[in-house]
């Protein structure tokens, strides 16, 4: 996923959430609806989250240095994980607290039509934001389902914005039901129940975000299809006999580390092995452009059935 496509979705969501937060909080001030307060805080939290995603994207573009020789690509994962914490604490826990408080001490809505009007406007704005996120995601989603895309995406911005927008629209529907039932029945308990449901929804979304971004922070390797592509690129030539073992790791959304131990003929000159490794690296980069850091170690392979060591300890030296 390009950074520009993620930024488009983030900026669209940020603009929508700032406007929505203001209208929701105004509606809460005039009506006293706890659902409006919960949704207002939710939108403020989302706005802060989008600013964090933009900040993470900017920091990730810093050049590598001696302290971080592989660069700062994982900054995007760090800020995405912080987003899940904010959504859980500020959005979810606050909504649950406010809902329980309103449940224990319910108050009638003072201007019941205002929350309904605000919710309808908010639904329109959130739909625009979600539409933008879906449009940008479709550029990179390929044939994956939405669940697969969210689980497998290495760039966190679009999955985060998608989940936030879906949660926002779902929260608006819950708030609409809570306020609507309060107006119809005259019982403010429904407003409190709607607020609690919003809190539960936000906590669940935050947990999903936290689990997925934690996996990226710990370190994920290439997908099986990408791993197979790299292996084919390595073996698609006469240079090496086989791959003894290979490991991959995403250093950032667009930067993949490839480390492999390759079997070479023990009789080869060192200069020939070095030239072969250069050729293999070029093939890997052509097949997998995200493979920015490639480390290939030459070795001599022994068949395990021959009861010898898996790899030879002979150092391959050049011969004149």
What are these regions (language model features)?
Residues 1, 67-69, 133:
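C-terminal ends of transmembrane helices
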Residues 1-22:
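Topogenic membrane-insertion module of multi-pass membrane proteins
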Residues 6, 75-320:
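Alpha-helical transmembrane segments and adjacent TM-loop junctions that form the membrane-embedded core
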Residues 16, 29-59, 96, 100, ...:
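Acidic (Asp/Glu-rich) catalytic motifs at the cytosolic membrane interface
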Residues 18-26, 31, 43, 47-53, ...:
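Hydrophobic alpha-helical membrane-embedded segments
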Residues 56-75, 105:
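Aspartate-rich (DDxxD/NDxxD/DxxxD) Mg2+/diphosphate-binding motifs
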């Amino acid at each position: 996923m390009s950074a520009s496509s993620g930024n488009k979705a983030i900026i669209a969501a940020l603009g929508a959430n700032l406007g929505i937060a203001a209208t929701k909080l105004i509606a809460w001030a005039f009506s006293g609806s706890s659902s409006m307060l919960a949704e207002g805080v939710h939108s403020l939290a989302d706005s802060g989250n989008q600013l964090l995603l933009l900040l993470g994207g900017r920091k990730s573009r810093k050049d590598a240095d001696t302290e971080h020789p592989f660069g700062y690509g994982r900054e995007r994962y760090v800020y995405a994980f912080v987003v899940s914490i904010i959504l859980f604490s500020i959005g979810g826990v606050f909504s649950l607290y406010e809902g329980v408080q309103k449940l224990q001490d319910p108050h009638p809505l003072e201007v019941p039509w205002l929350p309904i009007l605000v919710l309808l406007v908010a639904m329109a704005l959130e739909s625009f934001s979600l539409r933008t996120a879906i449009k940008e995601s479709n550029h990179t989603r390929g044939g994956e389902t939405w669940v697969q895309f969210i689980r497998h995406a290495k760039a966190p911005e679009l999955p985060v914005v998608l989940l936030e927008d879906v949660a926002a629209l779902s929260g608006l529907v819950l708030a609409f039901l809570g306020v609507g039932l309060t107006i119809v029945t005259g019982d403010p308990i429904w407003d409190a129940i709607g607020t609690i449901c919003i809190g539960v929804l936000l906590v669940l979304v935050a947990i999903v975000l936290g689990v997925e971004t934690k996996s990226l922070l710990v370190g994920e390797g290439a997908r099986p299809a990408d791993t197979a592509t790299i292996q084919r690129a390595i073996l698609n030539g006469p240079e090496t006999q086989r791959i003894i073992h290979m490991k991959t790791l995403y250093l950032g959304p667009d930067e993949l580390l490839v480390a492999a131990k390759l079997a070479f003929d023990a009789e080869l000159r060192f200069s020939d092995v070095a030239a072969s490794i250069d050729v293999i690296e070029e093939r890997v980069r052509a097949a997998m452009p995200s493979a920015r850091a490639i480390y290939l170690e030459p070795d001599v392979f022994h068949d395990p059935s021959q009861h010898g060591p898996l790899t030879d300890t002979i150092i391959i030296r050049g011969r004149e």
